[in-house]
Amino acid sequence: MSFTHGYADNHGLRMYYEIHGQEVPGLPPLLLIPGGGSTIGTNFGELIPLLADQRQVIAVEEEGHGRTQPTSRPLTAENSAGDILAVLDQLNVGAADVLGFSAGGHTAVALALTRPAAVRHLIAASTFVSRDAVPDGFWDAMARATLADMPYTYKDADRRLNPDAGHLERLFELDRQRILDFPGWSGDELGTITASTLVVCADRDVVSAEYAARMAGAIPGARLLIVPGGHGDYLGELAASGGDLRTMHATVPFLLRFLGEQGT
């Protein structure tokens, strides 16, 4: 499938984006935000053709990921939300439906909080909004993590796009520090989200289905979808799915049905 691409500038950060599919009258584009360590291809390469057949899709790569080069600033959900707003402004997109996966889900939530009018539907996939989402062992493991723990799929994709020495190491540290420093949001903050929201979680995900239900309960009117599988295979994420796309094909109709519902 052919696509167009470009960069949007935001205070020295040049965010890479791709546009797949054609504009659909009456429907905003669907914005995809990959998870940590990922590129558009590794996270959404299998999913985009299914979505772009029915919706125009804009996919981005956050700072240090893929074709978006790192700067000296930290990688945070709020910084990335600002970068994405620069993309939307450059493309004259006033509002979009947004799907953020994992750490990209943090950015999607930050976007919905930063500029509520920019997010019509929000799909928060395999993500969390508070530090109590995961046990203490998760944080201990993240603090001890090294590049050797990074999935080969991510390493290979980054080395092909960015063969210069030190880039992969910088990517890994940006992601690791981002998670370690993640503050989460209060219930009062989450209560201000105006986007129609769907919380998606797999039954063998990083967070539990019980936590996902609690997260959905904190966002006004949010819906909940629990799917079989692990962290991202239901989106065709390359490292998680290993090429088995059955869960993705079963999940997509539910996502499209939610996106087709009347927005706020």
What are these regions (language model features)?
Residues M1-R14:
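N-terminal cap/lid segment of alpha/beta-hydrolase-fold proteins
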Residues G45, P49-A52, I58-L99, S241-H249:
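Active-site loop/oxyanion-hole signature of alpha/beta-hydrolase fold enzymes
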Residues V206-Y211:
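Conserved alpha/beta-hydrolase "acid-adjacent" motif
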Residues H106-T114, V119-Y154:
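Flexible "cap/lid" loop of the alpha/beta hydrolase fold
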Residues E173-E189:
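Active-site nucleophile elbow and catalytic-triad environment of alpha/beta-hydrolase enzymes
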Residues H11-Q69:
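Conserved HGGG/HGGXW glycine-rich cap/lid loop of the alpha/beta-hydrolase fold
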Residues P228-T264:
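Catalytic active-site module of serine/aspartate enzymes centered on a nucleophile-bearing elbow/loop
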Residues I193, V199-C201:
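Short beta-strand/loop motif that positions the catalytic acidic residue
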